Amino acid sequence: MTSTSPCLATNVPPVTAGIIIIGDEILKGHTQDTNSFFMCKKLRSIGVQVNKISVIPDDIDIIAGEIAGFSSRYTYVLTSGGIGPTHDDVTFEGVAKAFGEKTFPHPELVSLVQTFFGKSESWCPEMKLAQIPVSSRLNYGTDKRTGDCFKYPLVSVGNVYVFPGIPSLLEKSLEGLDHLFRNDKTHFHYREICVSADEVAIAGVLGEVNGRFRKHVSLGSYPDWSNNYFRVLLVLDSHSEAHLEEAHKFLIEHLPPGVVVPFVKDPVTQAAAQVYQLAHSGSPLGDKVAAALKTLEEALDTYSLEKICVAFNGGKDCTALLHLFHATVQRKFPDQKDKLQALYIRIVSPFPEMEQFMQSTTKRYNLQIYTIQGYIKQALVELKVEQPNLEAVLMGTRRSDPYSRTLTPMCLTDPDWPKYMRVNPLLDWSYRDIWDFLRTLFIPYCILYDKGYTSLGSMENTVKNPALRFTTPAGAESYHPAYKLQNEEEERVSRK
């Protein structure tokens, strides 16, 4: 990873910030810090350049030293954490020491503590929230959603602003007080370029761009080994839109031919528009998509969302099905906020990469996952007991799957099975159709498919497909990704 910072030719001095994350729990790995990410993104959007992030323990002397140093170097200092009623909440004491002050019970905060907690004794733990440095200012923000004034203020001393450590409170506070930091004289502009080549293959071009434009434009190069569609994300950043566009044009013109990927960053949010556009394209794939959407729409006309779930185990077919289902719901019920229901029949010894993909997909599509161990028939028996409201299950079955040639788009389970309507929108899709659909719309799929696997089961019965094996120029054995398989009949030869 490389990144350069521009020495911008401008008469306007930059407005800068330093962020201090305070908490033993962060340093010990007990809690993941998300506050610095939010603050960096928010501050940059209002013209403030974050120059440094520091994570320090709940120690008064360390807090004081870090704040004193940051306060002298940056326009603003934002701290997060260490505010509360317990012994390790010592941020206010650290701030006071940084400025050579004492803390005292601020009358306004004492009154607020009494109102919120019903406590008035000076020694009670809650009253520690009212004990702040003597030169403190109280900043009351406004909830931008409701227009209501915050009941509890943000404390600041000089150019130091003391935010809570709880992410929801910090985010609400910074949003409601962003006028304290807003810099309308500076606007940051950036462009992203997704590249399918490895970093080493474009290093020379990046060096040339940096040499030409670094005075006005910063260039960052960030490898992403887990992305299905690109290997490196290039980010151009500048205060000057004109310089940014000049650098962007030069870089595009000098990168190797064919390596720039027209990547769609968030295909889920745009699912309905993109999927239905493809369905109306008149292409062979578009016709398959249109037929699948028709089946899904008929299912949604017959069953309410509360009675439908999608069978999802992370494979390529059900990933395509999930995206189609999400798009259909998004189009049919644009105001629908409830989670889509999904059945995950978890096999023995699943690949860790598949488990990770399941987790990320659950979050990406806002799913309510019902996880059941074992084989499909027994899983449906358990599902009927645990979720008796469900009546239909969407399946990613294709006619090329075992025992599937006589199925119809909507058919009941066999008499000796739990009673469900099986909805099969992908019956007439081929292996190539699945991959064309996923990759045309830049839909994320399990990374194992990029490593030579074409059909995924458990770690015990699945190997890389030998039909995808090749030898690199250096003589090493490697595998093409699954979407490059030429003979579809070889899809399952890697399953034992």
Swiss-Prot record:
It catalyses: FMN + ATP + H(+) = FAD + diphosphate. One of its GO terms (molecular function) is FMN adenylyltransferase activity. CDD domains: cinA, FAD_synthase. In the N-terminal section; belongs to the MoaB/Mog family. InterPro entries: FAD_synth_MoaB/Mog-bd (IPR012183), FLAD1_M (IPR056596), MoaB/Mog-like_dom_sf (IPR036425), MoaB/Mog_dom (IPR001453), PAPS_reduct_dom (IPR002500), Rossmann-like_a/b/a_fold (IPR014729). Gene3D superfamilies: HUPs, MoaB/Mog-like domain. Catalyzes the adenylation of flavin mononucleotide (FMN) to form flavin adenine dinucleotide (FAD) coenzyme. The molybdenum cofactor biosynthesis protein-like region may not be functional. Pathway: Cofactor biosynthesis; FAD biosynthesis; FAD from FMN: step 1/1. Keywords: ATP-binding, Cytoplasm, FAD, Flavoprotein, FMN, Nucleotide-binding, Nucleotidyltransferase, Transferase. It comes from the Eukaryota. Residues 307-464 are annotated as: FAD synthase. Its EC number is 2.7.7.2. Coiled coil: none annotated. GO terms for cellular component: cytoplasm. Its cofactor is Mg(2+). This is FAD synthase. The gene is flad1. SMART domains: MoCF_biosynth. The lineage of its organism: Eukaryota, Metazoa, Chordata, Craniata, Vertebrata. It is an enzyme of class 2 (transferase). It comes from Xenopus laevis (African clawed frog).
